[in-house]
C-alpha cells in the first residue's frame, strides 16, 4: 500500500467548488438527512412538473428504488434545450476522428437540430415511448445524437459497444426485443475499418431465429464502404434526416421512466441488461461531473471511453451536456498514428480535464516519456482515471510526467450499476494517495463486511457494500427483476453488494482490490468468466473450460483459460490460435484469451465443483500455498496443471 500523501494543490484549493470543510459538511448532511439533501440538489436539472417526493427506496424485499418519482422532466431537454438561450453557439461536442487531420465541432444549436431531426425520423418509423432502440455505432457524433433522440421521445436506448461480435449483438437485441437498430456502414479504429453493418446483418439473422424481428435499420454513412442492403428494412440516415422537421417537442417523462438499458457481464453466462431511469440518473451524473471534476463553465472535458460503456454514457454524453460543457468524443485509439496521440489531442483542442483508463496509461508509460514531452499539455488542470484500480507506479507517472505535478488526479470508483461515480477524491478537498479511490461522494455510504456479513469497523479488508440508495442507482435488470435482487441484494441482506473487495486504511480512505466474484476486469471492461467459458465450450473440439484472471502488466487482468479437449484430440499451437479466434468471434476482441493451457482434467471436488481458487493460484504462478486440496476428486490433476502452466516466471 502506498504510504505517500499528496496534499491538495494550492492552485486547486484557490478556485475549487468544494473544499474539505464543505465536503465534510455536505457529506454529513447527505447521509443524515438524504431527503433534505437531495431535495435541494435534485433542482439542478429542469423539471416540467417539480417533484414533491424525493426518496422512496428500500434494499429489502423486492428492492423498490424510486427517486423524485412524481416529477416530470426530459433528459434531452436538459442536455440541449435549456442551454440554447444563453449558450446556443457554444461548442457542445468536439469530434476528433481516427485520422488526426479530421475533426469537427458541433454547437448546442446544431445539436438541437440534429437530435430533433433524428427523433422525428424515429417517430416517422413508428418508434414510440417505451420502445427499445439498439445503437451499434463507432465513436462518431451520431452515436450521441441517437441516444439523445431516443431520450427526447421516451424510447429506451440499448447501446452495444462497436467491438462486440454479431453473436453478442444478437443476444442483446433478443433480450430487450428491440425492433429498430441504428448503425453505420463501417467504423474506423487505428486506421482499420470495422464492418459494423455487416455485423448488424448477421446479428439480425441470428435474432430472427429466436423470433425477434428487426423491422428497420438506420445506417449512418461513415466511410462509404460497400455494405449489404435489405430494401424496405435498411434506410440511410442522411436521406432520412433531410426529409423531416428540425423541431421535435420533448416528451414529458416521469422520473422513474426507463432511460436506457446497458448490458454488462454477470458471473453467469447471460449478460445482464442494467436498467437506468430518467430523473435520478441525470441529477447524479450531472452532479458528479460538476463536483468530482471541479468543472468550471466553458471548460473542455475529455473522457476517452467509448459510448458503448457506462463511462461514455455518463461522462461523454449525459453528465457534461447536462452541465453545458464542451465534451470531446474521440474515434481513435491511444497509439495511432503513434503513442503521442492523446497528448497531441489535448494540445490541439485545449483540453482542461482528461479522464482515461489505467490500461491506456500503463501502455503509454511503457512507450516512454518522449511521446508525452513532445506536447505542452499546458491547458490541463485535472486528470482522472476510471475502469479499474490504478497501480501506484502508473499513478506516479501520470501525476509527474503527464501532469507535471500541477494537476490533481481523481481516481474514481464506480460501476455500470451505480450510474455515476461513488468513491473519488474531490480536487480541492482531498489529499491524494496513489492507488486509493479515497472517500465516498455525497450520499454514498460504503460498508466493509467479511464473508459472513459481519460489519468491519476501522482499518479493515473486506467486501464492499453500500448501505443506502443514491439517485444514480440502477433500478432493475431488464425483464428480470428477481435477477437484480438475487445478484446485488441477496449475498448480504439489506445491502447493495458491489462484487468488489476493498481495504479501508487508518485515514478512512478506500482502496479497491478487485472483483471477488467470477467477473474479470480486462482493460477496464467487465467480462464474465462464464461468457468466455461458454464461448470456448461451443468449439467442437473442446470438452470443458475454466477461465480465471491473472495479473497482466498492461490490461490489469489477463484472461487465462484452462481447456480440456474431446477424447482423441490433442492441443497444439494451431488449435490454440483457432480457439483465440473463436472466442473473439463469439464475444469480441475485448475477450481475447491471453493464455490457453490444455489440461487432461480440471481440479474438481467430489461433488463436481471446479476449485477456481487453485486455478487462480496456478495462473498467477503462485502455487506454494494452494490451501486445502483434500476435497479434490483427483489431486494428480493439480500436478499436471502446475507442470504445464503457461505463465511461469523466468527464473
From Swiss-Prot:
Cofactor requirement: Mg(2+)
Processing and modification events after translation: Acetylated. Deacetylation by the SIR2-homolog deacetylase activates the enzyme.
PROSITE patterns: AMP_BINDING
TM regions (residue ranges): none
Binding of ATP, residues: 387-389, 411-416, 500, 515, 526
Amino-acid positions noted as binding CoA in the UniProt annotation, renumbered to this chain: 189-192, 311, 335, 523, 584
HAMAP family reported in the protein's UniProt record: Ac_CoA_synth
Family: Belongs to the ATP-dependent AMP-binding enzyme family.
Role noted for this protein: Catalyzes the conversion of acetate into acetyl-CoA (AcCoA), an essential intermediate at the junction of anabolic and catabolic pathways. AcsA undergoes a two-step reaction. In the first half reaction, AcsA combines acetate with ATP to form acetyl-adenylate (AcAMP) intermediate. In the second half reaction, it can then transfer the acetyl group from AcAMP to the sulfhydryl group of CoA, forming the product AcCoA.
Designated name of the protein: Acetyl-coenzyme A synthetase
Native species: Agrobacterium fabrum (strain C58 / ATCC 33970)
